Each structure stands twice: as C-alpha cells, then as structure tokens.
Amino acid sequence: ASDVYKRQGVMYVRGDSSAPAYWQRPDKTKDTMRGEWIYTGDRFVERDGYYYFQGRADDLIKISGQWVWPLEVERCLNEHPDVHECAVLAHQLTDKRMALCAVISLISGIEASDQQTLTLRNHVKSFLTPYKSPRLFEYVTEIPKTGTGKIDRQALIKRSKPIKDNKGLFT
C-alpha cells in the first residue's frame, strides 16, 4: 500500500436536510455557507482510495514555521502503553514563540517524572518528525471533558500559563 498522500483538503457538504442558515447568526452563516455548500472545517487526506480525518482546520498549530495537527500527535501518544489519554495544545512561551504542550493522563500506577517525559518524547520522535514532538508535558489525573464527553480544550487553554524554560517540565 502506498503511503503517499494524494489529496488533502476541507470537507464541504450539501443535502436536502442541510439548514439554509444559522438561526440569528448572520456572521456564522457567512463564514460557513458557500452557495449550496456547507464548509465543515473538517480536514481530510485521501490515501489509497480512503479519506482520513486529520482534524479541524482551526486546530492547526504552527510550530517553527511548520504546521502540526494536534490529533496526529495525540494519536501517537495514545498508542504508548503508559498513556491513558492526552490532549495536545498550542502553548505560548514567555518569548512569544509557540510550542506544543501535551497534557497527559497516565494509566494507574505510572508516575509522572522526567524519565517518563523523556520516554514519551522519544516515542513521538520515533514515529513522527521531530518538530511534532511536544516541548512541554503536563501530567494530570484527569483530562477535562465537555458535556458530550469530548476533551474540553477550552478548559485546558484557560488554565495554561506561559512557561519560560521547558527543561524537565512536568507538573
């Protein structure tokens, strides 16, 4: 099977059950509706005749001039046997540069440590290009969720603070 990405882009949909506009939200309607088509903001890549979800277009993070899909890094981290679940966010350092921050909930019995951070960082680097490896790691007991059970990224972002130095960071 070929690993070459043939096409990538944003999904547009239309159909008989599509709403013609957002209720009392002309701004949202203008951003989303393209004639008869609805801009979903969901990015996909076609590979070997299948379409793979990459993430939301507005989730893309630019790190050192390179675009990173948080979902790709999350999938890689979630494959590590010590990780219960995780979220990857953009984090602004005090010098205004952006860095990837992995918020990790470890499985029961695994302790957060500098060695654990090094292990997870090396795991990501062994599967993804080095710039996709998070610089910052934060360990939490539980990842906050929305009412629908999705990761509450806004809650994670709100509690995030700029960090000067990333050496050995874990909390």
Identify the residue ranges that each predicted region occupies:
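Short, small-residue-biased leader/transition segments that mark boundaries at the very start
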Residues: 1-5
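Glycine-rich active-site loop/lid that clamps phosphate-bearing ligands
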Residues: 11
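AMP-binding/adenylate-forming catalytic core of the ANL superfamily
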Residues: 15, 20-21, 28-31, 41-132, ...
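Catalytic tyrosine of NAD(P)H-dependent dehydrogenase/reductases that use a Tyr as the general acid/base
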Residues: 22, 38, 149
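Short, small/polar residue-rich loop motifs at catalytic or cofactor-binding pockets
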Residues: 38-40, 138
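AMP-binding/adenylate-forming catalytic domain of the ANL superfamily
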Residues: 126-150, 168-171
